[in-house]
Swiss-Prot record:
The active site is at residue 62. It catalyses: uridine(38/39/40) in tRNA = pseudouridine(38/39/40) in tRNA. It holds the Pfam family PseudoU_synth_1. It comes from the Bacteria. Belongs to the tRNA pseudouridine synthase TruA family. GO terms for molecular function: RNA binding; tRNA pseudouridine(38-40) synthase activity. Keywords: Isomerase, tRNA processing. GO terms for biological process: tRNA pseudouridine synthesis. It is an enzyme of class 5 (isomerase). Its EC number is 5.4.99.12. The lineage of its organism: Bacteria, Bacillati, Actinomycetota, Actinomycetes, Kitasatosporales. This is tRNA pseudouridine synthase A. It comes from Streptomyces griseus subsp. griseus (strain JCM 4626 / CBS 651.72 / NBRC 13350 / KCC S-0626 / ISP 5235). CDD domains: PseudoU_synth_EcTruA.
């Protein structure tokens, strides 16, 4: 996965949103409806191309997860881009299903890679704990928790999780992939008007199921089933704990992806590719 388009191609950055309800995640799969599959099909159609141009994305969201601020890139032949640049957004809007929208398509600066150049990803997870349930008009984006939640206890637990750690206890292990991440922010707020609690979760990157597992641990603290120190104790153990529940995906939204200044894009991509170890960790 290069940080430059091949000669004769233009790297195009795409900024997009989607409602994840009816998608089997971002990544294309045989016989399943995915965000990547829909966009690649639409690109092939509107550019009248005989080949599929593969997308690279900042955050590979799971089935049912939404995105407001997703970023991807695609390398298009220079002739294709020159022909379709001006009308590409409008044509894609007419071809794509209504639950996925592309808001911007523009040539990316040198060194840009939607996945590896990213400095951080910011997610929001929304939970309602009112006895009567969740507003029917927001039920597709808010989880209902049937016990009252203590905001202060959840934030006390969250503060112990921030920093660079091995999040193996909160991730679904993937062969050859590190579970070391820097959790930059984990903070809960409650909307006084609706009562909905929103967790802001920001990190340089996330491993599989990490956000939803962190939320699951926080809810057990919030409803009093676990003490505030428990999520950090699970983290320190570095193994999956059967008590950590991965919450449902529909409450989760990818809100924003941030990138460094153009001159630093390639360096950031190279840094992100390095296999990470914690300070003081041995090689063997």
């Amino acid at each position: 996965m290069s940080d430059q388009a091949e000669p004769g191609f233009v790297r195009v950055r795409l900024d997009l949103s989607y409602d994840g309800k009816d998608f089997s995640g971002w990544a294309k799969q045989t016989s399943r409806r995915t965000v990547q599959g829909e966009i690649e099909d639409a690109l092939r159609t509107v550019t009248r191309s005989s080949v599929t141009y593969d997308l690279t994305v900042a955050g590979r969201t799971d089935a049912g997860v939404h995105a407001r601020g997703q970023v991807a890139h695609v390398d298009l032949p220079e002739a294709v881009w020159a022909e379709h640049e001006e009308k590409l957004l409008r044509r894609l809007a007419g071809r794509l299903p209504l639950d996925v929208r592309i808001w911007r398509a523009a040539p990316a600066p040198a060194g840009f890679n939607a996945r590896f150049s990213a400095l951080w990803r910011r997610y929001a997870y929304r939970v309602g704990d009112r006895p009567g349930g969740v507003d029917p008009l927001t039920r597709g984006h808010v989880l209902w928790h049937d016990r009252p939640l203590d905001l202060d206890a959840m934030n006390e637990a969250a503060a112990l999780m921030v920093g660079e750690h091995d999040f193996a206890a909160y991730c679904k292990k993937r062969e050859g992939a590190t579970t070391i991440r820097t959790l930059q922010k984990l903070r809960w707020v409650r909307d006084p008007a609706t009562g909905v609690l929103t967790a802001t979760v920001q990190a340089d990157a996330f491993c599989h199921n990490m956000v939803r597992a962190l939320i699951g641990a926080a809810l057990f603290v919030g409803d009093g089933r676990r003490p505030a120190a428990w999520p950090a104790e699970v983290l320190a153990a570095k193994v999956r704990d059967p008590g950590v529940h991965v919450v449902r995906p529909h409450g989760l939204t990818l809100e924003e992806v941030a990138y460094p200044a153009d001159a630093l894009l390639a360096a950031r991509a190279a840094e992100a590719r390095n296999v990470r170890t914690l300070p003081g960790a041995g090689c063997c």
